[in-house]
Each structure stands twice: as structure tokens, then as C-alpha cells.
């Protein structure tokens, strides 16, 4: 599987993501700097987590306006798989590639802990290696992960099966509406999620529940 | 308004710069004339306690700082220790006490920023952070506000920068009501052939300014941090800097990228006393003069004076000496990261520190003497008064189960989850143990088996009662915590927080603590490779308890054999290593005596360093051989709290024998050098007898005291407590306190 990891100033989980992709796919992703206007031919584009541009102004707002994001949008329109994790999710929202918004956590505090996720739709390109309804462990680490969408948008997301992951077993860490942790776009090729599957992919992490997300993509690409 | 350079130097102005009349006379003698206003500022920046260590230097020299593993001891931005395979760990701890009390969020944030910069300035990528925090009494009106601000500040900076916070401490004591302590630790990983130093080399080379622009924030910060607090504290807010973790993250990446090109000859971050300290350091170390043209310094405010620029403590700035032929390449890297890059001066051969501003020479000082000729004091010190030993017979028996629950839910021993869940503990994907155990553990990237363990320790109430034993104990506990994971303790960094050294009793605490620390470090081959001294932690004559924080680093050769505190399974024998026959004896200065009986009395538990080493070496051995399935040291709250923590971490209960003598001393005594271990053996198993015999031969007492299993912890004759009830007591206090100030 060929993958690309987008790099912007202030992103800081890019190294985690590169390590996870390398370990799981056996191939190091190419990295693409924010000023690039074209992306290489890849099966998967990942926007990792962090604090792009310091999260100043609004999380992901500045990053979404960098040249590389236009290229990401073009690829996404052509059906290339795109994953945005944490700040990457925020950037995808700001870029208009996913519906809804992420607000400050209900606690108003940064939260880093392990939560439980339910695979709400196992029929996406990103979740097919999971069983429908499967409960998995996954860490979160964010300050602004409180997902919100207007009623009609929310109805559409829910109705079309666009919710990929939900916080489960009362572990919603941020107040997200309907316990939403991750969503896909209407076409099903763009995934945004707050939790960090890349931090739970090997024995050293104390578990491998995050692996199947990448393996889902790998299965399609292989 | 611009501050002119020709302000008349009056005795009041000299005093306002924190310089004593005899110190000012020393300046006059040194330069043979009256200093300009900018020069006075430069002297005050270089000669304050914070930067010059004038009260502590004499005693710091007595500390052990070398060993076969030490690549760089104190004197650089951070210490450097070899971990084999061409790799090294670079680390330091530094205080940001004064600013954090004035403005908790920014004070703590910039403390984290400063220590991270110290580490990556040396060419290391930061891989772990810790924070040792001390606050006033929970019922003091400022405490809740300070805890909230400091924790948010640490998280706000560290999380955005992208370093996992894997350990730390939080304590409460009314003696910190007027002065909280924020000691920030950072460690990084580097190649031993890729370490960068601050010593400039070569005449006529460009001095380059990198990073963020210079503003008026933090002017005089180091001088502020070298004085006590009084009623005017609110006026000191402008001396606190403002942090920008985003710029620091960019600065990290740009610096590491630049270092890889071979362009860097010398590098120094701008910390306390900013441009002044960094430029003098680089020049003086390299036996070179430095000339700076302030008109070329990137500024974010208009009409800044030379005085302000030289004393600004704006964050996220670096000074470098670069190879001239690499200049375009270097500039391109910094532009890519959106950072300022400006050639602001050059190295010279005249050993002068010359500052030009607006075409005028505003300062011209001898560069070596600015650092080397700083005053040094042998301050008078007095043997501190020590409380008499506790007569254990005066401590009435209390219910063991109730006492344990009370301790687990006390401000000092309750779970710190509320704090560390606001820190990113997982970023970088290498965290093997996060806060809640004996030490934070991070694996070494690109190595199949190695990991590093980190722990920060000190027990201020021990230091207050006997600063010599307290100093020893801080080192021993740190060594013990690292050992309990199976690590080889490598080296430490110390952060010595005390009151006003001009008072002989405070100086006495300092001197005796240093002696204790030195003795323990020598006995345990645990050298000090970096550190920081914070004095004048005092408000209106009330000093903090002596708080010499010790942060240590250990190496785990194979993390698959690392120990954790959680019970590993049911039906496993529980062993107590290094304990006296009656398990525990020492209640003086114990958490039990204070929190259950309301008495702060007695001498602290003494540390027998030879015993400490013997027990620790044995424990490390049985962890690595795989005999031991869980390990935890006994510290605050003694054996009972250690067992409860092992149960809570696993959800598995335990049944402990009834102690032969006093149950309170056995379960709550804070005797040193003890560990609780478990082995996957039944109590009657012959292998267990062999293990105990092996320990005896090594001069280590190893006593089987119980068995894991079930969902309850039963301590001897005491009523059994469910693990759920333990957790409820343990997890409840902190969130309740932070929610509504509840003290229960």
C-alpha cells in the first residue's frame, strides 16, 4: 500500500503515524509538505494529529487553507482514501471535506486517556476488518473533540451510515453529540476521527486494537 | 517611549537591580568607570542568584558529577549520559517557581518550554517530560487556582509541542501557600556523535539569531526570581514571559534539521536573561569576544531600547555561531519553518562584550569577567534544629482499614489522574509506563529492546525535619523507583528549592541537604549531571520547606522483562524485600502520623545506603530473571498503601498475614529500602524457599507476607476492603477538590 502523510507546522503525531503505517504496511509513507500543490499517486492520504499553526484562530482553520489541502481535496474527489486523525479531523472539517464541527471538550480540559469505541459501521473502507458493532480500545488526546452537527446534518450522517465509530460504554470523553468519535463523508472515502488508532498497533502499546483500521485500508489496496 | 541609555546610576537604581552596594563596587573596580544603564542591566542579569549561583556554587562543587556513563556533566544546557549503541540521553530539570505563582498558566508553560529548549539545544529530540509540583494547603484561597493554571499551562505547552509527560509529583503543604514550586524535567535522545555545545569557536564568524521575535515580556525575570515575594507581587506580572509552543515545535524541527547539515558551530538557547546570558556564555566559554548589533535583532514591538532587548526573556529564541559557507542553507531551513533568522553580530578576538544600538556603543564589558567574576558567597549557615525521635508508644492504635482509606483519599496520596489526564502521555508512540506507577518508561526508538525509566522524588516533610537524611532519602527513593521497573539507575538532575539563603538557618538546610544528596549519589553511583537552584522561595519571611527535587534516569536493557506495579495474576506469593523482621517500624514523619493522627513529629526514616544498594541490586536481578511478576517500592503511606496501589492497578485483591508486632508500624511505617514483589509461585512452593534463601545469601531480607487473589484487600486482622472501595477513596479526592474546592 502506498501512502502519504501530510506535514504542516505544528502537527506532532506525524512520526507516530509514519511509524504505524510503516509497521503495518511494510512500506514507509511519503511525506508531503504543506506548500506542495500536487500529491504523488498513493492509495491513502493521512493528515495526522497535532496542533497545526498552534491551533491559533481555530483548530485546523489555518491548515485547511494551505496549498496542500487543495491537492488533498482533488484526490478525495477522485476517490482516493483520506484519513484525518485528531487535528487531521479538524482540518478536514475546516476544509469542508467532512460535515459538522468539533468544539472544545465539554470539560473544557485537554484529555488523554483510553476509551472504548464501537464500530458503528463496519462496511466502510476503513472499518471492514472489524466486526459490526465490535467494541475496541483506543486512546484519545485532545482539547477540541466535542463533535457537533446541526439537526438536519446529524440526521443525514446518522441516516446514511456515516458514523464510523462511537464512544462506547459511557466513555465519551468530550461531550460529542450521539457519542460520535469518527465519521466518513457521503462517498465513504474520507474518514475523520478524534481517537488515535496509530497509538495502539503493537505489543509495546499494550494492545493492537487500532491495527484493523489500517488493515482495512490495506486490504482494499492490496 | 524609549528608555535612554544615559540614565544616571543612583544607589536606588542599583538596589532596584538587585545588586548589593559591595556588588556594585565590584562592578566599578572591574570596569574602572560607572556603567551605562544598559551595562547595569547586563550585570544585574548575570550576577543575580538565578544566573550566577553565587550562594550555592561553593556547595554544588562538592556533588559527584562524573562516572563512566557521563558524557557531559553540569555546566552545559543539559547533562548527557551514554546509553550504549552510540546513543545518549540528554536531560535536565529546572524550576519556574516564581513566575508560576504570579501567573500560573504562562509561568508553568514557559517552564516546560525552557527545559525542552535546553534539551534540544544540545541536539537531542525530546522524548519524555515530568513535572514536580508543590502547592499550598488545599483550603488556601489561591491553591485551587494555582493547581488549575499550572496543570493547564504544562499541558498546553507540552501537548502542543508533542512530548509525552510520563511522570511527576504533586504535593500540598501550607508552607507553600506563598510560593508554589514548578520543577520541569525534560529528556531527549541524541547520537553521541551529534551533541552540540555552547562554546563558540573561530574569530569573525557570524552570530545568528533564530526563532521568535524579541518583545518586552519577561524583562528582568531572572532578577525577579532572585528575590523574595511581598505585598507587591501583583506588580511583578509583566516579568512573566508568554509561551508559544507552536513556535517552539517549529524551532525544534528547524534546529534538528540545521544541525544535520553540519552548519552549527555553537548553539545556546535564550533562557533566563535572554540575549545577555546566551551571548556571554558562548563567548566566554570559547575565549572569544562577541559584538552584537541590536538594530538587526528581530523585534515585535517598536522603539525597544538596548536595555530592554538585552534583558527581554521572550521565549522560543536561539543564538548560534554558524559556518559562514552554510548560511544560505541555514536561512532556507528557518524560512521554511516560518522563523526569524538574522545575523546580529560576530565573534571577535578582544574578549569584549560590545553592544551597538542606533549606531552607538551602549555597552562594552569584559566578557570573561561577566561570568567568572560574579560574586561568590560562603554564606554563614547554622545547624538546623531537628525534632526529637518519635516515641512510638505515644501513637494510639487506629483501625488499619479506616486508616488506609483515609490515606488513599488524602490530598498527598490520592490519585493524580485529574492532573495527568490533562497531559498527553502517549504521543510519539513509545510510552510503556505512564503516570501511576513507580516510574515513567519510554522505549528507545529504533532499538528493539531498550527503554528509559524516569522518576522524580523528594519528601519535603523529611527534609524539613532533617535536611541531611531528607536529601539522602530523595536520591534513594528516586533510585528505588527506577530499580522497581528493572532499570539500571544511570544519573540524576537536581532541582534545589529553598528559602532565603541570607538566613543562616535556611543556608543550613541547603548545606545539609547537599551533603545528604552527595553522600547518597556517591554510594549509589548515581552522579548529578545537571540541575538548577531556586532560592528565595519565601514570602513575608515564611520559607517553603526544603525541597531538593531529584529526577533520575534509568536504562532498561530489555523492556519485555520490565516490572510494573499491578499484581500480575491470582494466587501469587507476595514478598516484602529489604524490610525488618516486623515489616515496618518507623512512624516518625510518616504520612500516617500526619494524616491519621494529625501529628508532624519525629525524625524522618533514616536511609542505610549500603542496605539500599544491596536490596535494589537484588530486586533488579529477580525482575530481570523473570522470577518477579510485579514490583513496587514502599514510600508514603508504607506497606499498606503500596499493596493497595498494586491491587488498584490490577483489580486483583490480596490477603496479607497478620503482623507479629504493631499493625500500624508494620502497615504504615515508612522504613526505607523496601519493595513489595510478587512471584508466580504458591507459598508452599520449594522454589519460593530457594528464592528467600538466595536473598538471604545476598544479605537481603525477603519475607513472604501474603497471596494475591479475589477482589478484596485484607490486611491481617483488619476488615477486608474491596478493590472498588479502595479506588473510590483514591480517585475521588482530586476531582472533587478541583470541582468545588471540597476538602473531603
Swiss-Prot record, chain A:
The lineage of its organism: Bacteria, Pseudomonadati, Pseudomonadota, Alphaproteobacteria, Hyphomicrobiales. GO terms for cellular component: cytoplasm. The keyword Mitochondrion does not apply. It is found in: Cytoplasm. This is Phosphoribosylformylglycinamidine synthase subunit PurQ. It catalyses: N(2)-formyl-N(1)-(5-phospho-beta-D-ribosyl)glycinamide + L-glutamine + ATP + H2O = 2-formamido-N(1)-(5-O-phospho-beta-D-ribosyl)acetamidine + L-glutamate + ADP + phosphate + H(+); L-glutamine + H2O = L-glutamate + NH4(+). Part of the phosphoribosylformylglycinamidine synthase complex involved in the purines biosynthetic pathway. Catalyzes the ATP-dependent conversion of formylglycinamide ribonucleotide (FGAR) and glutamine to yield formylglycinamidine ribonucleotide (FGAM) and glutamate. The FGAM synthase complex is composed of three subunits. PurQ produces an ammonia molecule by converting glutamine to glutamate. PurL transfers the ammonia molecule to FGAR to form FGAM in an ATP-dependent manner. Part of the FGAM synthase complex composed of 1 PurL, 1 PurQ and 2 PurS subunits. GO terms for biological process: 'de novo' IMP biosynthetic process. Residues 3-222 form the Glutamine amidotransferase type-1 domain. Keywords: ATP-binding, Cytoplasm, Glutamine amidotransferase, Hydrolase, Ligase, Nucleotide-binding, Purine biosynthesis. The active site is at 86 (nucleophile), 196, 198. Pathway: Purine metabolism; IMP biosynthesis via de novo pathway; 5-amino-1-(5-phospho-D-ribosyl)imidazole from N(2)-formyl-N(1)-(5-phospho-D-ribosyl)glycinamide: step 1/2. NCBIfam families: FGAM_synth_I (TIGR01737), PRK03619.1 (NF002957). SMART domains: GATase_5. The keyword Nucleotide-binding applies. Its main location: cytoplasm. The gene is purQ. One of its GO terms (molecular function) is glutaminase activity. CDD domains: GATase1_FGAR_AT (cd01740).
From Swiss-Prot, chain B:
Coiled coil: none annotated. One of its GO terms (biological process) is 'de novo' IMP biosynthetic process. This is Phosphoribosylformylglycinamidine synthase subunit PurL. Mg(2+) 2 binds at residues 118, 269. PANTHER family: PHOSPHORIBOSYLFORMYLGLYCINAMIDINE SYNTHASE SUBUNIT PURL. Substrate binds at residues 95-98, 117, 241, 313-315, 534. It comes from Chelativorans sp. (strain BNC1). The lineage of its organism: Bacteria, Pseudomonadati, Pseudomonadota, Alphaproteobacteria, Hyphomicrobiales. Mg(2+) 1 binds at residues 94, 532. Keywords: ATP-binding, Cytoplasm, Ligase, Magnesium, Metal-binding, Nucleotide-binding, Purine biosynthesis. It catalyses: N(2)-formyl-N(1)-(5-phospho-beta-D-ribosyl)glycinamide + L-glutamine + ATP + H2O = 2-formamido-N(1)-(5-O-phospho-beta-D-ribosyl)acetamidine + L-glutamate + ADP + phosphate + H(+). Part of the phosphoribosylformylglycinamidine synthase complex involved in the purines biosynthetic pathway. Catalyzes the ATP-dependent conversion of formylglycinamide ribonucleotide (FGAR) and glutamine to yield formylglycinamidine ribonucleotide (FGAM) and glutamate. The FGAM synthase complex is composed of three subunits. PurQ produces an ammonia molecule by converting glutamine to glutamate. PurL transfers the ammonia molecule to FGAR to form FGAM in an ATP-dependent manner. Monomer. Part of the FGAM synthase complex composed of 1 PurL, 1 PurQ and 2 PurS subunits. GO terms for cellular component: cytoplasm. Its main location: cytoplasm. Gene3D superfamilies: PurM-like C-terminal domain, PurM-like, N-terminal domain.
Amino acid at each position: 500500500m502506498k501512502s502519504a502523510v501530510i506535514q504542516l507546522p505544528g502537527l506532532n503525531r506525524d512520526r507516530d503515524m509514519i511509524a504505524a503505517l510503516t509497521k503495518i504496511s511494510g512500506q514507509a509513507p511519503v511525506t508531503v509538505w504543506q506548500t506542495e500543490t500536487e500529491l504523488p499517486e498513493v492509495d491513502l492520504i493521512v493528515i495526522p494529529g497535532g496542533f497545526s499553526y498552534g491551533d491559533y484562530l481555530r483548530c485546523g482553520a489555518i491548515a485547511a487553507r494551505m496549498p496542500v489541502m487543495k491537492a488533498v481535496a482533488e484526490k478525495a474527489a477522485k476517490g482516493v482514501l483520506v484519513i484525518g486523525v485528531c487535528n487531521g479531523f479538524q482540518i478536514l472539517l475546516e476544509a469542508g471535506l467532512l460535515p459538522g464541527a468539533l468544539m472544545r471538550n465539554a470539560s473544557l480540559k485537554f484529555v488523554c486517556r483510553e476509551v472504548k469505541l464501537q464500530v458503528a459501521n463496519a462496511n466502510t473502507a476503513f472499518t471492514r476488518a472489524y466486526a459490526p458493532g465490535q467494541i475496541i480500545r483506543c486512546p484519545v488526546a485532545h482539547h477540541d473533540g466535542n463533535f457537533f452537527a446541526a439537526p438536519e446534518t446529524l440526521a443525514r450522517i446518522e441516516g446514511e451510515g456515516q458514523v464510523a465509530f462511537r464512544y462506547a460504554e459511557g466513555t465519551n470523553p468530550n461531550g460529542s453529540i450521539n457519542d460520535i468519535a469518527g465519521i466518513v463523508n457521503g462517498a465513504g472515502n474520507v474518514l475523520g476521527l478524534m481517537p488515535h488508532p496509530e497509538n495502539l498497533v503493537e505489543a509495546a502499546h499494550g494492545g493492537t486494537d487500532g491495527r484493523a483500521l489500517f488493515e482495512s485500508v490495506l486490504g482494499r489496496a492490496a | 517611549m524609549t528608555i535612554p541609555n544615559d540614565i544616571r546610576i543612583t544607589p536606588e537604581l542599583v538596589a532596584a537591580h538587585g545588586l548589593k552596594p559591595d556588588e556594585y563596587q565590584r562592578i566599578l573596580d572591574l570596569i574602572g568607570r560607572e556603567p551605562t544603564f544598559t551595562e547595569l542591566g547586563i550585570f544585574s542579569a548575570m550576577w543575580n542568584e538565578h544566573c550566577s549561583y553565587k550562594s550555592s556554587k561553593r556547595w554544588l562543587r562538592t556533588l559527584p558529577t562524573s562516572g563512566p556513563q557521563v558524557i557531559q556533566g553540569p555546566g552545559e544546557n543539559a547533562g548527557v549520559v551514554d546509553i550504549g549503541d552510540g546513543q545518549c540521553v540528554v536531560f535536565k530539570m529546572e524550576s519556574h517557581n516564581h513566575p508560576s505563582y504570579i501567573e500560573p498558566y504562562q509561568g508553568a508553560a514557559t517552564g516546560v518550554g525552557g527545559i525542552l529548549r535546553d534539551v534540544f539545544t544540545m541536539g537531542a529530540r525530546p522524548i519524555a517530560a515530568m513535572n514536580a509540583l508543590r502547592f499550598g494547603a488545599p483550603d488556601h484561597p489561591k491553591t485551587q487556582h494555582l493547581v488549575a493554571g499550572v496543570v493547564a499551562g504544562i499541558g498546553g505547552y507540552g501537548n502542543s509541542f508533542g512530548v509525552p509527560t510520563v511522570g511527576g509529583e504533586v504535593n500540598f503543604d501550607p508552607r507553600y501557600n506563598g510560593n508554589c514550586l514548578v520543577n520541569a524535567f525534560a529528556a531527549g535522545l541524541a547520537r553521541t556523535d551529534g551533541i552540540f555545545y555552547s562554546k563558540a569557536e573561530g574569530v569573525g564568524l557570524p552570530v545568528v539569531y533564530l526563532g521568535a521575535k524579541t518583545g518586552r515580556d519577561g524583562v528582568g525575570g531572572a532578577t525577579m526570581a532572585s528575590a523574595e515575594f511581598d505585598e507587591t507581587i501583583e506588580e511583578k506580572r509583566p516579568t512573566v514571559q508568554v509561551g508559544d509552543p507552536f513556535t517552539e515545535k517549529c524551532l525544534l524541527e528547524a534546529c534538528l534539521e540545521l544541525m544535520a547539515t553540519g552548519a552549527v558551530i555553537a548553539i545556546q538557547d535564550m533562557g533566563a536573561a535572554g540575549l545577555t546570558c546566551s551571548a556571554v556564555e558562548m563567548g566566554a566559554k570559547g575565549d572569544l569576544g562577541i559584538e552584537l548589533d541590536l538594530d538587526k535583532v528581530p523585534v515585535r514591538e517598536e522603539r525597544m531600547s538596548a536595555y530592554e532587548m538585552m534583558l527581554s526573556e521572550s521565549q522560543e529564541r536561539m543564538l548560534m555561531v554558524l559556518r559562514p559557507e552554510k548560511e544560505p542553507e541555514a536561512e532556507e531551513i528557518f524560512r521554511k519553518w516560518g522563523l526569524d533568522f538574522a545575523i546580529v553580530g560576530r565573534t571577535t578576538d578582544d574578549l569584549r562584550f560590545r553592544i551597538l544600538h542606533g549606531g552607538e556603543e551602549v555597552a562594552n564589558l569584559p566578557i570573561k569577567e561577566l561570568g567568572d567574576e560574579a560574586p561568590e558567597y560562603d554564606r554563614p549557615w547554622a545547624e538546623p534544629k531537628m525534632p526529637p525521635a518519635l516515641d512510638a508508644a505515644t501513637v494510639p492504635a487506629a483501625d488499619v482499614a479506616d486508616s488506609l482509606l483515609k490515606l488513599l483519599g488524602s490530598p498527598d496520596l490520592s490519585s493524580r489522574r485529574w492532573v495527568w489526564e490533562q497531559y498527553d502521555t502517549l504521543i510519539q508512540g513509545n510510552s510503556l509506563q505512564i503516570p501511576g506507577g513507580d516510574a515513567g518508561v519510554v522505549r528507545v526508538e529504533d532499538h528493539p529492546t531498550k527503554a528509559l525509566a524516569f522518576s522524580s522524588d523528594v519528601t519535603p516533610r523529611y527534609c524539613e525535619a532533617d535536611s541531611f537524611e531528607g536529601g539522602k532519602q530523595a536520591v534513594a527513593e528516586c533510585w528505588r523507583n527506577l530499580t522497581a521497573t528493572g532499570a539500571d539507575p544511570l544519573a540524576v538532575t537536581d532541582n534545589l528549592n529553598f528559602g532565603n539563603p541570607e538566613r543562616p538557618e535556611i543556608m543550613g538546610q541547603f548545606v545539609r541537604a547537599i551533603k545528604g544528596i552527595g553522600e547518597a549519589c556517591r554510594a549509589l553511583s548515581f552522579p548529578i549531571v545537571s540541575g538548577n537552584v531556586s532560592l528565595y522561595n519565601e514570602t513575608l519571611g515564611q520559607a517553603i520547606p526544603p525541597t531538593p527535587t531529584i529526577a533520575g534516569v534509568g536504562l532498561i536493557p530489555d523492556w519485555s522483562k520490565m516490572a510494573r506495579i499491578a499484581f500480575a495474576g491470582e494466587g501469587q506469593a507476595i514478598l516484602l524485600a529489604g524490610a525488618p523482621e516486623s515489616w515496618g517500624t518507623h512512624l516518625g514523619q510518616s504520612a500516617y502520623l500526619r494524616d491519621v493522627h494529625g501529628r508532624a513529629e519525629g525524625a524522618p526514616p533514616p536511609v542505610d545506603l549500603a542496605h539500599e544498594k544491596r536490596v535494589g541490586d537484588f530486586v533488579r536481578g529477580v525482575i530481570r530473571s523473570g522470577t518477579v511478576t510485579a514490583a513496587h517500592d514502599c514510600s508514603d503511606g508504607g506497606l499498606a498503601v503500596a499493596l493497595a496501589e498494586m491491587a488498584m492497578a490490577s483489580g486483583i485483591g490480596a490477603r496479607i498475614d497478620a503482623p507479629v508486632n504493631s499493625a500500624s508500624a508494620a502497615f504504615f511505617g515508612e522504613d526505607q529500602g523496601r519493595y513489595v514483589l510478587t512471584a508466580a509461585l504458591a507459598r508452599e512452593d520449594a522454589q519460593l524457599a530457594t528464592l528467600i534463601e538466595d536473598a538471604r545469601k545476598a544479605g537481603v531480607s525477603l519475607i513472604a507476607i501474603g497471596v494475591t487473589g479475589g477482589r478484596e484487600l485484607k490486611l491481617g486482622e483488619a476488615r477486608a476492603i474491596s478493590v472498588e472501595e479502595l479506588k473510590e477513596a483514591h480517585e475521588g479526592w482530586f476531582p472533587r477538590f478541583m470541582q468545588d474546592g471540597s476538602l473531603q
